[in-house]
């Protein structure tokens, strides 16, 4: 399978008369874009903003991030989501607007799964999305049934973000890209001797799938991942719209759709393929809640890795707590097959850093890369501009915020300053591979 990714680098985003891209400038007709978003009768309010790195702007509650892209052959970019037609991702030519994203923010209501981004100041270092130029869709919906729920599906706003990203991506459909990245893996059984003599490595992905009720979990080709067993996938599918992010995981642990589209760990394995490793592909697992479901997934993962001839594996989980059991079970099952395995995850060691980092551990899980502590307290000064509603951080049960604490008070102070756990930083731990955090020993 061969994917060509044509990249257009965005130097500036402005509002203007015609939605277009020229000489590094992305111009958006705001009214036309809003009219397109408002075609969904569930959207009751929508506004667009542009923010760039260094802007003293705080965004909350942030729900999703998507890179604007378009398929040149006319196929929908997110099959099963933005169109019911199912077509295969990961092949042909896709054009992408690089250095920018569409961010989806609630006008008022947040929830456990939503987060915060500071584009400038002290808080900017905590999230990758402060380094991007962002088109911010701030919206509200008629989904009254969940407005006061701590856990929200956020379907209308998330779908609006995906459609808007495709709408903006159309600006470069018929243009010549500044560069073309090519992603191609030969069939596993048809590789050269030079490649097959290298250590075979699989990448095991564990996207969020904990919720038994449909609509909260990550989706693959529009299918809720709670309803699947581990599956072999081509990495190109992941990088090209097959998976969208869900609306459940504490936000610093979240893998946004933008993360799936640009997954740095996958791209690094591609870069090493044929040089230091024989990249065998992706085993797409899950993170279901019942013990038997976890055991079944571990059995599937280990069997597939062994059948593919893997000598090494990387396991990455989207989340912590209950999913730690899946994470460790997969590592142990792989190690039991003689497959050397490295884990990628964050940890929950408490605000003092002294608690056990994962819910369950095993001596065979002896090579784990930590991407952060979800419980670490973060204090941020007031911001002059807030897009969305900052009070949502305290009022609506965001995973790193609280309405009251006998010592710390509310997460949101009267002057607009914030104290919260890292949990609420949008995609803050970046398990996908571009975390800038380091660890120190004392």
Curated annotation (Swiss-Prot):
It comes from the Bacteria. Keywords: Oxidoreductase. It catalyses: acetyl phosphate + trimethylamine + [thioredoxin]-disulfide + H2O = glycine betaine + [thioredoxin]-dithiol + phosphate + H(+). It is an enzyme of class 1 (oxidoreductase). Its EC number is 1.21.4.4. GO terms for molecular function: betaine reductase activity. Disulfide bonds: none annotated. In the first step of betaine reductase, the substrate is bound to component PB via a Schiff base intermediate. Then the PB-activated substrate is nucleophilically attacked by the selenol anion of component PA to transform it to a carboxymethylated selenoether and the respective amine. By action of component PC, acetyl phosphate is formed, leaving component PA in its oxidized state. Finally component PA becomes reduced by the thioredoxin system to start a new catalytic cycle of reductive deamination. Heterotetramer of two alpha and two beta subunits. Component of the betaine reductase complex, together with components A and C. PB is substrate specific. This is Betaine reductase complex component B subunit alpha. The gene is grdI.
């Amino acid at each position: 399978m061969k994917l060509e990714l044509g990249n257009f680098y965005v130097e500036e985003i402005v509002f203007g008369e015609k939605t277009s891209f020229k000489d590094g400038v992305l111009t958006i007709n705001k009214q036309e874009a809003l009219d397109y978003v408002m075609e969904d009768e569930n959207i009751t309010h929508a506004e667009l903003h542009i923010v760039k790195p260094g802007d003293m702007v705080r965004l909350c509650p942030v729900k999703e991030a998507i890179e604007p892209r378009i398929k040149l052959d006319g196929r929908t970019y997110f099959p099963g989501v933005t169109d019911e037609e199912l077509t295969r991702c990961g092949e042909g030519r896709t054009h992408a607007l690089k250095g920018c994203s569409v961010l989806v923010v609630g006008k008022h209501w947040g929830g456990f799964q939503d987060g915060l981004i500071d584009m400038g100041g002290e808080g900017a270092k905590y999230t990758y999305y402060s380094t991007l130029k962002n088109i911010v869709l701030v919206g509200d919906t008629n989904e009254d049934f969940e407005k006061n729920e701590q856990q929200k599906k956020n379907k209308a706003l998330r779908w609006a973000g995906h459609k808007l990203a495709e709408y903006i991506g159309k600006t470069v459909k018929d243009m010549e890209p500044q560069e073309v990245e090519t992603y191609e893996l030969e069939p596993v059984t048809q590789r050269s001797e030079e490649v097959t003599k290298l250590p075979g490595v699989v990448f095991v992905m564990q996207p969020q799938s904990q919720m038994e009720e449909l609509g909260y979990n990550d989706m693959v080709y529009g299918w809720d991942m709670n309803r699947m067993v581990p599956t072999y996938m081509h990495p190109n599918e992941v990088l090209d719209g097959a998976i969208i992010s869900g609306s459940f995981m504490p936000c610093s642990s979240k893998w946004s759709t933008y993360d799936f589209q640009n997954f740095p760990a996958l791209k690094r394995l591609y870069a090493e393929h044929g040089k230091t490793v024989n990249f065998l592909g992706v085993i797409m697992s899950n993170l279901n809640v019942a013990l038997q479901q976890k055991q079944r997934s571990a059995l599937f993962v280990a069997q597939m890795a062994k059948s593919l001839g893997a000598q090494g594996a990387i396991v990455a989980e989207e989340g912590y707590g209950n999913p730690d059991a899946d994470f460790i079970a997969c590592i142990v099952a792989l190690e039991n097959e003689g497959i050397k395995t490295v884990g990628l995850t964050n940890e929950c060691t408490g605000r003092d850093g002294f608690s056990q980092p994962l819910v369950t551990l095993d001596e065979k899980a002896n090579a784990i890369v930590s991407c952060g502590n979800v419980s670490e307290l973060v204090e941020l000064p007031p911001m002059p501009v807030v897009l969305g509603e900052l009070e949502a951080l305290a009022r609506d049960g965001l995973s790193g915020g609280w309405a009251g604490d006998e010592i710390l008070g509310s997460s949101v102070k009267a002057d607009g300053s914030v104290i919260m756990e890292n949990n609420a930083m949008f995609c803050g731990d970046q398990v996908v591979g571009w975390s800038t955090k380091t660890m120190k020993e004392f």
